[in-house]
Swiss-Prot record:
Biased composition (Polar residues): 560-573
Species classification: Viruses, Riboviria, Orthornavirae, Kitrinoviricota, Alsuviricetes
Catalytic activity field: RNA(n) + a ribonucleoside 5'-triphosphate = RNA(n+1) + diphosphate; ATP + H2O = ADP + phosphate + H(+)
Domain of life: Viruses
Gene Ontology terms for molecular function: ATP binding; ATP hydrolysis activity; mRNA methyltransferase activity; RNA binding; RNA helicase activity; RNA-directed RNA polymerase activity
Domain (Alphavirus-like MT): residue spans on this chain: 59-224
Protein name: RNA replication protein
Domain (+)RNA virus helicase C-terminal positions: 863-997
Chain intervals for the UniProt region annotation (Disordered): 537-573
Any one of the GO BP annotations: mRNA modification
Family indicated by similarity: Belongs to the potexvirus/carlavirus RNA replication protein family.
Domain (+)RNA virus helicase ATP-binding: 695-862
Amino acid sequence: MAKVREVYQSFTDSTTKTLIQDEAYRNIRPIMEKHKLANPYAQTVEAANDLEGFGIATNPYSIELHTHAAAKTIENKLLEVLGSILPQEPVTFMFLKPRKLNYMRRNPRIKDIFHNVAIEPRDVARYPKETIIDKLTEITTDTAYIGDTLHFLDPSYIVETFQNCPKLQTLYATLVLPVEAAFKMESTHPNIYSLKYFGDGFQYIPGNHGGGAYHHEFSHLQWLKVGKIKWRDPKDSFLGHLNYTTEQVEMHTVTVQLQESFAANHLYCIRRGDLLTPEVRTFGQPDRYVIPPQIFLPKVHNCKKPILKKTMMQLFLYVRTVKVAKNCDIFAKVRQLIKSSDLDKYSAVELVYLVSYMEFLADLQATTCFSDTLSGGLLTKTLAPVRAWIQEKKMQLFGLEDYAKLVKAVDFHPVDFSFKVETWDFRFHPLQAWKAFRPREVSDVEEMENLFSDGDLLDCFTRMPAYAVNAEEDLAAIRKTPEMDAGQEVKEPAGDRNQYSNPAETFLSKLHRKHSREVKHQAAKKAKRLAEIQESMRAEGEAESNEMSGGMGAIPSNAELPSTSGARQELTLPTTKPVPARWEDASFTDSSVEEEQVKLPGKEAVETATQQVIEGLPWKHWIPQLNAVGFKALEIQRDRSGTMIMPITEMVSGLEKEDFPEGTPKELARELLAMNRSPATIPLDLLRARDYGSDVKNKRIGAITKTQAASWGEYLTGKIESLTERKVAACVIHGAGGSGKSHAIQKALREIGKGSDITVVLPTNELRLDWSKKVPNTEPYMFKTYEKALIGGTGSIVIFDDYSKLPPGYIEALICFYSKIKLVILTGDSRQSVYHETAEDASIRHLGPATEYFSKYCRYYLNATHRNKKDLANMLGVYSERTGVTEISMSAEFLEGIPTLVPSDEKRRLYMGTGRNDTFTYAGCQGLTKPKVQIVLDHNTQVCSANVMYTALSRATDRIHFVNTSANSSAFWEKLDSTPYLKTFLSVVREQALKEYEPAEAEPIREPEPQTHMCVENEESVLEEYKEELLEKFDREIHSESHGHSNCVQTEDTTIQLFSHQQAKDETLLWATIDARLKTSNQETNFREFLSKKDIGDVLFLNYQKAMGLPKERIPFSQEVWEACAHEVQSKYLSKSKCNLINGTVRQSPDFDENKIMVFLKSQWVTKVEKLGLPKIKPGQTIAAFYQQTVMLFGTMARYMRWFRQAFQPKEVFINCETTPEDMSAWALNNWNFSRPSLANDYTAFDQSQDGAMLQFEVLKAKHHCIPEEIIQAYIDIKTNAHIFLGTLSIMRLTGEGPTFDANTECNIAYTHTKFDIPAGTAQVYAGDDSALDCVPEVKHSFHRLEDKLLLKSKPVITQQKKGSWPEFCGWLITPKGVMKDPIKLHVSLKLAEAKGELKKCQDSYEIDLSYAYDHKDSLHDLFDEKQCQAHTLTCRTLIKSGRGTVSLPRLRNFL
């Protein structure tokens, strides 16, 4: 499996990963559905892991809770296993609820029998009343089952059952018996159940829930060993067994076998007859336990508790490896090996016995006292067995030697969960046999039945009032009760009998009156509106109306308006008082409503006025079609230029109306005819189909189709090319966005429901989900994305929604490929954007859009929208009846929580990488409808077509917000000129105020930790493994032909040889470092790279801005802050020693070239643990010396931006700059989440990989802080034109720049947030190229597009945040107790100082570093693993033994 996993992990293509995940999800769904029956519960992570070990999957998204979910899941799983075994015929179930048959997947038609006896009081509530019997009766079926009860019964119960039920052949039984209870151990599955021992019994507690606990006697555990049960015939006398023959004995035997076992739950199969069964019965044992031999007297002073064998071996090897194993050291080692959470499982007495036993082992000699067979001559070897026999007898008489004692003392007794099966024989034990046949006492349930008689329950219902809201149903129910006489009448409420009325009739009457009032009110509003429209029509004039109506085309056949039947000449509508909100109260006020009679035009008058308005409309013949899609179309509207907007345009005459193909659902045909969208026969362009098929076959386009076999592509193109012509009936529906093109079709599909042969093909998955949500009562496979439809097939009727977004030639190819398609429905908008193919070698790239071909078969274009309000729609030249004003605004900042529209797909992916997941391109947002959208304007906007801009501007229903990403006003106006729609949408938005910096709260005082003791360890236990693989000096050194070997491995001390000593005077190492760390280029190439990475720098900055909480608008420049930062930089420089200042004279000279850099090799000891004793010395690090004025200028710039960064920085982000370990500890304790895995990020060649993209990021960051332009330009110059003695350096980071630390840190933050999708509130800590996060975030999909464009490569390190595995940051471990130095790295560094003889000089520093861990004392056992504890102990002992009597540091006085 490791190889398979390695192959899957090697896939880096996001599309391939998506396909793998999709395939995996399809496989997972039925599996999870299968396991849902037994395990529908929400499980803890630990319990879920245990259940997976038993083959039971857990749904991580389940939220169903249970008091003991894991134990209940195992119980359900055993019932599921039992259900697969039981025959499909009646079975007798004993002690089982009938509803549990669901877990067995039993057919409810099988007439199963239930025998439940109420043995305990709670059995009355547990079992249905109809299944409870007085006592167990004869079983009349071949198979029976006993549920979770057999372990409480006497073995003679099996004898009685099989003796009294001759038809019974097989008995299944489930038992709940924890095997470890036989050894009085703690639960081996503590996440499922726990155990408590009381005297001669114990309690099984599932999920630590006392309400579900069982009490067992230890005698119940005998059921774990039973293999066969034998008995004699009861008709014989008690001594009749003497006359038994073998045949008679065999007739009375049942065989017991373990069928399945999960934790403490077991399924037994008990079969009549003497059959074979395994001699040894084995139960699951997750860990290996042992018990020390009982070697002390009295026996009570021996350790009897089973202990993990691994722990015993660790303790044994410890006491035998240390020089002197003191009693306190052994106790400390035991404390180290036992988790704090497990300490309550041990008694202090048991620990004393264990330590005494280990101390005894430590005192014995391990050298053998016996002679060997290799020494001596022939005579000696001949007499050797005699000598050995004499020595053995001597030890038996006078006592064992130490070696023999040790061998016997370490002969641990294994705790094995395997038992030899036993046969229980009742044939030769008359008393036992009599006990087996005596009648069992069964609880009587007759009195309980009397307590819950039906009469008492029904009496409760007879007291219900007869005048309740649902009086009719209550009266019918009451009349059926036996307690009431047939002629008894229902009492009515007190009061006058004549005034009583049925509440239902009162409510209906009241509802009718309310509805009448609403109808009259709506009629009055309609009459008033018609009068206004009629007045408006008269103002338009007859001339214009006649001119426009002449171009409307032929009148459709169904253009007749519906006629109205005769009605009253006049309507009288009442004017009423406000109607109460609740109808229950209205009954008391209805009579008090005053009605004033108001004369309104009659129905006939209203219809006459309406008809007059319609007659004056240019589109009067199209009113029925407009009404069919929800438009009244009684108003004339005009665009910005004053031209009348026609709701119906682009009419095509001469198209014949074909009949719908056979099998077309009548609901669908009805809706299409109502819109005048009858089908027309369309001959397909086979050349377009062949171009698309060729591209798919050669894998030039597509995502899913590229994964298909080559044979499938050959079959696709072969079938298309074999056709000479292909015609199909098609309904082409064109209309503006939001015109309701799809609404009528969706309405028809909802009426059709499931079972239709219809497929809806959609261009995007978002649109597919939208259709699935709007038409929920159909099969989910009805809606497919276009590639899935091509691969998976379609129905005979295919609906293409937004077909302009499908690849050119796709529609023709699909119809040609599937000959069963007989009707297609195309919905789209010829005014909006169309599909754009980016693959340059694709044949379809040169095809025209599908709308161009199919437009000539579209009967008309519906130029009306329900989406946009009238003002916006009219600006776009579209008809709308939505009233109100569309809000338009513009600023340089983004709004949160609303979709973002950008001009390019590249920008969309990058914006999504910054967390804006609802980002769409102008063209890709087609089909989107949102109340608010924001449209980003940049240099790509001016190259967008009018169709694309129309698509973007028509998405919002209420508000459009424009975001100008450029600070250049002339560029902004150029963007506005790029489209005719933008100049009308201008507004001003106020800027946000700068938020103030809030200082962190003081660290709370914590209680001191309890004292502890660490066991003594071997001095070389940490470094020994590195020394074993150490090579010779010259095998490890770097060799150069011109300079010879390097000199990094020094002295003969193996400890010092582990560490590489890099020195500035080492020429070989210098040139190796220059070759590895520095790259040369030229100014022109550097500047070209800087410009080419502009878009990447933009994305890096957006991610950084979001991560650090910087304001959306630029931060105004503050001269006061700049001068303060410059003063700090100057003071810092002048604080150096005079000697250092003199050494820098050359770089202070005005003659020093501003672009020149002096490069040196950094002298250092390499103390990283991962680089100890490497087979080959690694190159060193360089230090760059710049012109001092340059360093101070850019140092001031970095400090200035740091000042503002700290003001806006979120509290969950910590930057280890000018802070103390105490500050970092306080922050970690308040913000870090230790309940999940964490991620630490490291980089390969971090400085050298900061190329033009990072420089672009730094420039944008500086501009956002309004750094003066001349300083920014100078920074660009020094980064692109830096000279060393070899030439011009490539763009990179150099140690020695002014902003090195801040720039590294901020680049680290930007890169991390660009790569990872980091959840809000995640704790993050940064310093230079080091970082750590308290979660493991997912890699953004957008990052895959940037990964190859960035030189920077990260190396994530995941830690589980548990004992021995904590996130590391700059040599510090972040733990639940605060930060502390990594004990292994601290010890390694200390050993180097000790080996060089410099420990006295730096002891104070090591004591301070050590104290951060030492202060936590006993808690270290929960933080450090065994190896870390060893390193910590050795560091403590080394410092204590260093010879210092006192320590001046107050915090370390208790320590030493």
